[in-house]
Amino acid sequence: MAARPLSRMLRRLLRSSARSCSSGAPVTQPCPGESARAASEEVSRRRQFLREHAAPFSAFLTDSFGRQHSYLRISLTEKCNLRCQYCMPEEGVPLTPKANLLTTEEILTLARLFVKEGIDKIRLTGGEPLIRPDVVDIVAQLQRLEGLRTIGVTTNGINLARLLPQLQKAGLSAINISLDTLVPAKFEFIVRRKGFHKVMEGIHKAIELGYNPVKVNCVVMRGLNEDELLDFAALTEGLPLDVRFIEYMPFDGNKWNFKKMVSYKEMLDTVRQQWPELEKVPEEESSTAKAFKIPGFQGQISFITSMSEHFCGTCNRLRITADGNLKVCLFGNSEVSLRDHLRAGASEQELLRIIGAAVGRKKRQHAGMFSISQMKNRPMILIELFLMFPNSPPANPSIFSWDPLHVQGLRPRMSFSSQVATLWKGCRVPQTPPLAQQRLGSGSFQRHYTSRADSDANSKCLSPGSWASAAPSGPQLTSEQLTHVDSEGRAAMVDVGRKPDTERVAVASAVVLLGPVAFKLVQQNQLKKGDALVVAQLAGVQAAKVTSQLIPLCHHVALSHIQVQLELDSTRHAVKIQASCRARGPTGVEMEALTSAAVAALTLYDMCKAVSRDIVLEEIKLISKTGGQRGDFHRA
């Protein structure tokens, strides 16, 4: 790293005009042509010198796949003056206490450290960064950092027209403005606030002050604003805009589902039908956008394809959240608290080692669209506050002690039981459990970091819950006659038309013995096929819904709730699966629960079979069943 200060010193020397002291020699004024030629040659010599003496890129900001991270996004605040539907819940989000947020000095200290290591672009984000009172001062301080080429801001535009002259004077060089509709009434519906005309005023102020291009970010959502694609594209005819159409992405609290997403190819086809002459524009290195231009238009359009065609291979971005956590991937849920280490007095080298370790753990690419949609992540406004809440509270809270701040195991990933809440009808989202209310107080999240080993280090709980109670309940009525066979021994479907509707609940389980090699790959999420646990969990949910199509004499049941939980057992190198189903009707749901557990187990086998064929599926069994004429059943 010693080479870097030397290189920067050489750059400073070469930037300065050549000066010399004369002891009486006459001064010769070159002609204009010679001056221009000499200046051009001098620039060429400087560039050649810098190429030959360039400092190596920081090892701390280079991941294991050789990606050099030169772009840092810093969240200045969690607060926002809008409530965009795709970004945060309508009621807002619990905010981190002010004492736990980065101070201005801490922001600048971290920025200075990252720039020293090779970051040359910083973008200020939020929340809404322009509601932070000292945002102009922060930009001015960043502008003084040698080596920082670009200071950008992503804003909703509400305060932009008022602040932009000051921000430009302070050193702001790039602007992204979020705008998802050109219809004022629809704007108010999407963001749940007024302000459309303020945003448009901000866009025109940016153009007036000479920003080119002014980037406009538009999240495209089916049934909401996909019909405005052509209107947005038409804006680029007379304005120096880069309208960036962003695929709708899943973040906690935005009720994401696949049906809302409009893919890049679909958007591109729509624009091409109107402007067949649309041309592809060469992309900059590490660009996230696929850029196109309509001949004769002043601006251009771009597509950010986070969901359908990821750009992980060229990712050069790191993020620091408002509470000081380093996040190496937008779609990841792991983070490192730089704030805590900074306040504990960590030296610059210690901070660099922490940063380097986090960057080194960055994966080759994020999970696919299907897996991302299930991941527990911060609401977009926070990026990301990670607490695992169950999908529904237990009928008997005393069955287990549930602590939302205690994360078990070695691979903190997500609350599997809550992932399907946005995809499958009937899943219930609970109120905050009493214990969480006690821990969190009124309106603020607390986070718990610990390096201690879990009291049960052999298990990894992916979703809070307990395995079925062993106590029998109710009379055990049995039949000595098979209900699906008639008097002549032929298959027959039971007539349930006259049976009363009652609440039916069934829980089934299965165990998959993976072996040490496959188990390790599943635990570390390193299978080439993807996240085996997520795929198996969703397969179990889907299987429960189609049980009547798989089991010939099984009735179709309108399930009101499906929950699939997976737990890693390192002592047996196994995955334990528990599936529960609920419905109100004339027939039970034990077949749905059993099918769910079995198919989840089969899916795990399929995901891991390339690694080992010595995988055993066992203990597929009914754990409990309630409701119905024959009484309740709980396996002893």
From Swiss-Prot:
[4Fe-4S] cluster 1 binds at residues 80, 84, 87. InterPro entries: Aldolase_TIM, Elp3/MiaA/NifB-like_rSAM, MoaA, MoaA_NifB_PqqE_Fe-S-bd_CS, MoaA_twitch, MoaC, MoaC_bact/euk, MoaC_sf. One of its GO terms (molecular function) is S-adenosyl-L-methionine binding. [4Fe-4S] cluster 2 binds at residues 312, 315, 329. PANTHER family: MOLYBDENUM COFACTOR BIOSYNTHESIS PROTEIN 1, MOLYBDOPTERIN COFACTOR SYNTHESIS PROTEIN A. Isoform MOCS1A and isoform MOCS1B probably form a heterooligomer. This is Molybdenum cofactor biosynthesis protein 1.
